[in-house]
Design a protein with these regions (language model features):
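Glycine-rich phosphate-binding loop of actin/hexokinase-like ATP-binding domains
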Residues: 113-183, 262, 270-275, 279-284
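Structural motif
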Residues: 93-94, 127-130, 250, 288-290
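ATP-binding/phosphotransfer module of carbohydrate and carboxylate kinases, centering on a glycine-rich
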Residues: 1-53, 166, 170-316
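Conserved phosphate-binding catalytic cores of ATP/NTP-utilizing and phosphoryl-transfer enzymes
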Residues: 1, 44, 92-128
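Short beta-strand-loop/turn "lid" adjacent to the catalytic site in phosphate-handling enzymes
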Residues: 49-95, 104-113, 130, 259-263
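Short, acidic Gly/Pro/Ser/Thr-rich loop/turn segments
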Residues: 14, 64-66, 136-140, 195, ...
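Fold-independent oxyanion-binding glycine-rich loops
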Residues: 9, 61-62, 98-99, 133-135
């Protein structure tokens, strides 16, 4: 058995590591995607800096994993599976969706990696759902199958999204003017936060999510109104997805955007929007919600997958 290279390839940043024997990532390095030409260059740089010579690789990709050629949704990178494996001598190359990898990580996470998001019952036996805004909006689920469960990817972040109530109609009208068809990802993502800010306060001209969050932390009323609406919409979307998957095992929110909100993440408002889905309020009241505080759940999931692959290979 040789080393396995693992990677969480996001729209803005990529994390590389080696899968440790205990099923956890080791020797983690982070690459800013804009600073390298393509995935092959990023992989080569990691291998050069660490001196690692992995025989296998498990990558999580922020985009749909279909066919031989794979393209990231919010990054210009694209690659072909066989060419990548041949260039680096991988005897096995496994590619999964980035949020599918996080779903695989859920059984590994402890109290050091998550915290409750609002009150809620204990998780029941059933589907666990993970979602979160980053460069895009990811959604995946872990089905209660076998000892570890079975993760499935989705493209739920691209469902159409709209106003609920008169106070949101003008906002969504302006969102439609700016970006045409409004999907959940157009609003609930890093690029979506300033987009939402421009729709709510067009005179402010917000361009970066960091500017909105920093303004809200400073007490700027306009920015705080944006983050309040963002939290409400995130709670509503999470409730939508929890109903779609009947996620009695709990809903887990990932991503640096939500973690960066800190005290701006009004848990009562989030839960109210999450539960406000008649006639199934009581069902959602029984579904606990959690915030993933670890900054590398995708790598943890890839390491778990690599360990599963090694165990399966040892048994053959």
């Amino acid at each position: 058995m040789g080393q396995t290279l693992i990677a969480d390839i996001g729209g803005s940043n990529s994390r590389f590591a080696l899968a440790g024997a205990a099923g956890w990532p080791e020797r983690v390095l982070v690459t800013e995607n804009a600073m390298v030409a393509d995935l092959e260059t990023a992989v080569a740089r990691y291998l050069q800096e660490t001196g690692a010579r992995p025989r296998a690789a498990t990558f999580a990709i922020a985009g749909p994993v279909l066919g031989e050629e794979i393209a990231l949704t919010n990054c210009a990178w694209r690659f072909r599976r066989a060419e990548l494996a041949n260039r680096f001598g991988f005897s096995r190359l496994q590619i999964v969706n980035d949020f599918e990898a996080i779903a695989w990580a859920l059984p590994q996470l402890t109290a050091a990696h998550i915290r409750p998001l609002g009150p809620g019952a204990l998780p029941q036996e059933g589907v666990k759902l993970v979602l979160g805004p980053g460069t895009g909006l990811g959604v995946a689920a872990l089905l209660p199958v076998g000892r570890r469960g079975y993760a499935i990817a989705s493209e739920g972040g691209h469902i159409l999204f709209g106003a609920h109530g008169t106070d949101e109609r003008g906002v969504f009208d302006r969102l439609h003017e700016e970006c045409g068809t409004v999907s959940a990802e157009k609003v609930l993502s890093g690029p979506g936060l300033p987009r939402l800010a421009r729709a709510l306060h067009p005179e402010r001209g917000y361009r970066e999510p960091e500017a909105v969050i920093a303004g809200a932390h400073r007490g700027e009323a306009a920015a705080q109104a944006v983050t309040r609406l963002f939290v409400r919409l995130l709670g509503r979307f999470a409730g939508d997805m929890a109903l779609a998957f009947k996620a009695l095992g709990g809903v887990y929110i990932a991503g640096s955007i939500v973690c960066g909100l800190g005290p701006l993440l009004d848990e009562a408002q989030f839960r109210a929007a999450f539960e406000g889905h008649p006639p199934h309020e009581s069902l959602l009241q029984a579904v606990p919600t959690f915030l993933i505080t670890s900054d590398q759940p995708g790598l943890i999931g890839c390491a778990a997958l690599a360990q599963m692959n090694e165990l399966a290979q040892a048994q053959t």
